[in-house]
Amino acid sequence: MQAPPPEHCPGVESEEAGKGSACSGCPNQGLCSDPNKKLEDPGKALVVESMKDVKHKLLILSGKGGVGKSTVTSLLTRYLARSNPDSNFGVLDIDICGPSQPRLMGALGESVHQSGYGWSPVGIEDNVCLMSIGFLLGSVDDAIIWRGPKKNGMIRQFLSEVDWGNLDLLLLDTPPGTSDEHLSVVSYLKDDANPESLRAVMVTTPQEVSLLDVRKEINFCKKQNIPIVGVIENMSSFRCGHCGNSSEIFPAKTGGAAAMCAEMGIPLLGSLPLDQQISKACDSGEDLTEFKNVTTEALEGICSKIMASFS
């Protein structure tokens, strides 16, 4: 018989399954450590039940840090919510050690409340809610120094103990790389019976140092059988606020995202500029999408392609 997982269970897919300190005393320890008797993670059933009313999940990924995944996640969410007022959207910040969404979404200082159905995510707009470990810290400057099993346990809690309600789309802001957080969230959310319910969008900048890592992330998705909606090239150009001329801050020496997408057979969803208004909005938590500008023009095309992929 399977017992409930311990608080910091590393998960059955982890190399630490049945071996970690959290496994000591767990009735499932022998089963998890035996490769011939692997069980499905007992926490997955809880996740499936909690997420049953979430229609679609979208991972925002990039192998490279600093390319703007969190910024792109917040911009996509804001624009999708504004252009689809009858749909409900959620954001889950699984960048455990570097949560940015509370600031980007203008929710710094908000707290999470407990209800009979679990944690209640923070409401951003009438049709947008957000959950982040940033809401659970005593100070925005507190450092989170956790090993993989504890981070995985936190992600499982976010997926199984948050009352997400009815969502048309949940966007997941991820950390760089293909680490424990990625493996954990994929193992919980991937549904073999409905593989199209979990998809991914890649974020890159034009230079090859970013594209190298994005290629690895694309291959990660292919190995995990996660459909890729497409690639967003962020910071593709800079438009001067005085003269209006555009210039390339990060030159695409190898052809940028367009060349990589053609090479790997992945759709290019569009490009976002390096925009001073984005920087100001990120720091203040304001909604940039309510104004007509070069960024919202680009977001219109990108978001329409994302929504079309789920229809």
From Swiss-Prot:
| Record protein name field | Cytosolic Fe-S cluster assembly factor Nubp1 homolog
Q: Tell me, how does this one assemble?
A: Heterotetramer of 2 Nubp1 and 2 Nubp2 chains.
User: Could you read off the lineage of the organism from its UniProt record?
Assistant: Eukaryota, Metazoa, Ecdysozoa, Arthropoda, Hexapoda
Question: Cofactor(s) for this protein?
Answer: [4Fe-4S] cluster
In this chain, [4Fe-4S] cluster 2 is annotated as bound at C240, C243
Location(s), subcellular: Cytoplasm
| GO MF annotations in UniProt | 4 iron, 4 sulfur cluster binding; ATP binding; ATP hydrolysis activity; ATP-dependent FeS chaperone activity; iron-sulfur cluster binding; metal ion binding
Instruction: Give the UniProt entry's GO cellular component terms.
Output: cytosol; cytosolic [4Fe-4S] assembly scaffold complex
- Please report the organism this UniProt entry assigns to the protein: Drosophila melanogaster
The record lists ATP as bound by G63, K64, G65, G66, V67, G68, K69, S70
The alphabetized UniProt keywords are: 4Fe-4S, ATP-binding, Cytoplasm, Iron, Iron-sulfur, Metal-binding, Nucleotide-binding
Keyword Nucleotide-binding listed? The answer is: yes
Question: What does the record give as the function of this protein?
Answer: Component of the cytosolic iron-sulfur (Fe/S) protein assembly (CIA) machinery. Required for maturation of extramitochondrial Fe-S proteins. The Nubp1-Nubp2 heterotetramer forms a Fe-S scaffold complex, mediating the de novo assembly of an Fe-S cluster and its transfer to target apoproteins.
